[in-house]
From Swiss-Prot:
Highest taxon listed in the record's lineage: Eukaryota
Record organism: Drosophila melanogaster
UniProt-listed InterPro entries: Arf1-5-like, P-loop_NTPase, Small_GTP-bd, Small_GTPase_ARF, Small_GTPase_ARF/SAR
Residue numbers with lipid attached (N-myristoyl glycine): G2
Biological-process GO terms, alphabetical: compound eye development; intracellular protein transport; symbiont entry into host cell; synaptic vesicle endocytosis; vesicle-mediated transport
Lineage: Eukaryota, Metazoa, Ecdysozoa, Arthropoda, Hexapoda
Gene3D superfamilies given in the database record: P-loop containing nucleotide triphosphate hydrolases
Protein name per UniProt: ADP ribosylation factor 4
Length: 180
């Protein structure tokens, strides 16, 4: 016997199921990333009030991605999405130097939550096409990622509008979640 329901479903249907929570400050590019992954194209977005949820299939893994609005009034609601989250995607607007401290604070607060203790962390350093964008190395420092203990994390430079870096991030996420 010894099969978990997840591995049984994988054997029957061939796809592993993963629950991913995608958060970040407002206007970081979360919804653009979600629909670029889902549809392969750029869609016109408006600020997300509440959430979007889509299934993204990639490399025999079925990711259920929850894209939760990032406005400051909505952020206290993020915690309602933490349960059973296996992977956390934190999207940062690499060009928004004025709010990087705010992004760091929100990320660090989230990572203290007990329900996310086992979730792996993928940071999308988005908007790398803009001339003033912070590099992944600079963001690693500003987000204090090197200070994280007992957490698997990875930062990926991305440009959601062009699709650059998104699948490289999913490759890392897939590999990490396959280890669990």
């Amino acid at each position: 016997m010894g099969l978990t329901i997840s591995s049984l479903l994988t054997r029957l249907f061939g796809k592993k199921q993963m629950r991913i929570l995608m958060v970040g400050l407002d206007a970081a590019g979360k919804t653009t990333i979600l629909y670029k992954l889902k549809l392969g194209e750029i869609v016109t977005t408006i600020p997300t009030i509440g959430f979007n949820v889509e299934t993204v299939e990639y490399k025999n893994i079925c990711f259920t991605v929850w894209d939760v609005g990032g406005q400051d009034k909505i952020r206290p609601l993020w915690r309602h999405y933490f349960q059973n989250t296996q992977g956390l995607i934190f999207v940062v607007d690499s060009n928004d130097r004025d709010r990087i401290t705010e992004a760091e604070r929100e990320l660090q607060n989230m990572l203290q939550e007990d329900e996310l203790r086992d979730a792996v962390l993928l940071v999308f350093a988005n908007k790398q096409d803009l001339p003033n964008a912070m590099t992944a190395a600079e963001l690693t420092d500003k987000l204090r990622l090197n200070q994280l203990r007992n957490r698997h994390w990875f930062i990926q430079s991305t440009c959601a509008t062009q699709g650059h870096g998104l699948y490289e991030g999913l490759d890392w996420l897939s590999a990490e979640l396959a280890k669990k």
